[in-house]
Amino acid sequence: MSVFSVLEREYLGGQRLGRLATVGPDGAPHVVPVSFAYNGSLDTIDIGGHALADSKKWRDIGRDPRVAFVVDDLLPPWRPRMVEIRGQASRLGDAGASLGPGFADELIRITPTRIVSFGLDGTRDLRARNVGSAADQR
């Protein structure tokens, strides 16, 4: 069973750009736009890019795997929607090509520990829940 709701999976499947936040060596956050795909077979978020292994986000995750990831948009007239995923990131050196042509071999994979979503069902109700172990919730 997926940690994501049906609406969350549908929303993530229809989006290609999100924002990844990592923790820098001095503890400061670093946020960048990234291309991604929801990996339904592993229930993870897979992030690819060009020269990913040379990036600050790649180095940050090597030091501290805690990340936050947000996908959001705005429908007219003013209907915000979003999914926020907090979790643990892994660096994989040989899976990026699975995202499509033009992506580096490297891939960042986020395993969710907390999911927050809003506006996916047309209401303003916030849905938040922990989905990982207590040790991962820090």
Task: Indicate where each model-derived feature is located.
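Short, basic/aromatic recognition patches
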Residues: 1-19
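Short beta-strand segments
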Residues: 16-50, 69
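Conserved hydrophobic/aromatic beta-strand scaffold that supports enzyme active sites
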Residues: 19, 31, 84, 107-109, ...
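A structural signal for short, well-ordered beta-strand segments
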Residues: 36, 87-89, 110-112
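Structural motif
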Residues: 42-44, 66, 88, 114
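Short, structured beta-strand-loop surface elements
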Residues: 51-106
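C-terminal edge-of-domain segments
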Residues: 80, 93-138
